[in-house]
Amino acid sequence: MDQEAVGNVVLLAIVTLISVVQNGFFAHKVEHESRNQNGRSFQRTGTLAFERVYTANQNCVDAYPTFLAVLWTAGLLCSQVPAAFAGLMYLFVRQKYFVGYLGERTQSTPGYIFGKRIILFLFLMSLAGILNYCLILLFGSDFENYIKTISTT
């Protein structure tokens, strides 16, 4: 790949790799809690602490494909920097959700709600990128250039 192509996706790749490390951390927490409870064997049921860790991890895993899809679509079709920033914010919020779920379940609610809003923001960025592509294709006008012109004045 040439440097320009790598430059267009490097921030998205960094956020993706950070999310992989975070998933590993969550899985390690589940494994650690399972070993504390059952010795060496892994079971899905057990103490309340294990149930909370397992459920929090499962909830994060369930939302992960959606996050990756909208992160990369928003970054490639709209703008890499805001998409990567929103992706980092989502990872912080997901960490807050995970840790909050281990305590009182009401502590996880702000992380959950803000995470949904970040996913919506990335989705809207993706739609804006698709709309811009359609405008270029149909009318030959680039919406992104209009935004840059307006924002520099």
UniProtKB/Swiss-Prot annotation:
The UniProt record lists the keyword Transmembrane helix: yes
Transmembrane spans: 9-30, 53-77, 81-102, 116-128
GO molecular function terms listed in the Swiss-Prot or TrEMBL record: arachidonate binding; enzyme activator activity; glutathione peroxidase activity; glutathione transferase activity; leukotriene-C4 synthase activity
Residue ranges that the UniProt entry lists as topological domain Cytoplasmic: 31-52, 103-107
Location of this chain's protein in the cell: Nucleus membrane; Endoplasmic reticulum membrane
An annotated GO cellular component: nuclear membrane
GO biological process: leukotriene biosynthetic process
InterPro entries linked to this entry: 5_LipOase_AP, FLAP/GST2/LTC4S_CS, MAPEG, MAPEG-like_dom_sf, Membr-assoc_MAPEG
Intramembrane segments: 108-115
Intrachain disulfide bonds: none
Short name of any one Pfam family annotated for the protein: MAPEG
Keyword Cell membrane: no
Topology versus the membrane: Multi-pass membrane protein
Gene3D superfamilies given in the database record: Membrane associated eicosanoid/glutathione metabolism-like domain
Residue intervals on the Lumenal side: 1-8, 78-80, 129-153
Domain of life: Eukaryota
Main location: nucleus
Key words, A-Z: Endoplasmic reticulum, Leukotriene biosynthesis, Membrane, Nucleus, Transmembrane, Transmembrane helix
Known function: Required for leukotriene biosynthesis by ALOX5 (5-lipoxygenase). Anchors ALOX5 to the membrane. Binds arachidonic acid, and could play an essential role in the transfer of arachidonic acid to ALOX5. Binds to MK-886, a compound that blocks the biosynthesis of leukotrienes.
Domain topic, free-text comment: The C-terminal part after residue 140 is mostly disordered.
Oligomeric form and interacting partners: Homotrimer. Interacts with LTC4S and ALOX5.
Family (UniProt): Belongs to the MAPEG family.
Name of this protein: Arachidonate 5-lipoxygenase-activating protein
Organism field: Oryctolagus cuniculus
Species lineage: Eukaryota, Metazoa, Chordata, Craniata, Vertebrata
